[in-house]
């Protein structure tokens, strides 16, 4: 969609394989759970504060441009790498059930002392700062 004024988009459970929100620069909430997405580009969605993209096939998620994100639910995907490095990360994160997740980019190792990541097995992780 080219609707730059779109603030909320709920397109979950539609069997979509592709979603382009690059022109929706004022998007604040995106719900695209229960689809068949393999990628999701939110680099232009700097106003995004809630992202729900669980139960897809997403392998990488880069949220480095999402400076106001408050809630991320990306559980049950095929995530290998998750980029949370944005200089001010303070969001609630649920990335459970991503068995191949071995790379999380963060600004500080202290981020992993918070509740959102207490359930992950860090033995297989590489931390990037």
Language model features: what each stretch is:
Residues 1, 22, 43, 64-67, ...:
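C-terminal helix/turn sub-motif of individual leucine-rich repeats
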Residues 1-4, 15-18, 22-26, 36-39, ...:
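Thr-biased low-complexity repeat/linker tracts and other Thr-enriched repetitive architectures
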Residues 7, 24, 45, 107-109, ...:
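Compositionally biased, intrinsically disordered low-complexity segments
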Residues 7-11, 28-32, 49-53, 70-74, ...:
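Conserved hydrophobic beta-strand positions in leucine-rich repeat
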Residues 14, 35, 56, 77, ...:
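Consensus "Asn ladder" position of solenoid repeat domains
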Residues 80-129:
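Leucine-rich solenoid repeat scaffolds
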């Amino acid at each position: 969609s080219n609707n730059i004024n779109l603030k909320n988009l709920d397109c979950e459970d539609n069997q979509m394989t592709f979603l382009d929100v690059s022109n929706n620069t004022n998007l604040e909430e995106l719900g695209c759970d229960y689809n068949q997405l393999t990628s999701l580009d939110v680099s232009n969605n700097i106003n995004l504060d809630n992202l729900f993209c669980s139960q897809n096939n997403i392998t990488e998620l880069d949220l480095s441009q999402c400076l106001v994100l408050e809630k991320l639910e990306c559980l049950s995907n095929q995530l290998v790498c998750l980029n949370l490095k944005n200089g001010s990360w303070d969001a609630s994160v649920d990335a459970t059930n991503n068995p191949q997740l071995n790379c999380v980019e963060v600004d500080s190792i202290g981020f992993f002392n918070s509740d959102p990541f207490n359930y992950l097995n860090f033995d297989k992780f590489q931390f990037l700062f």
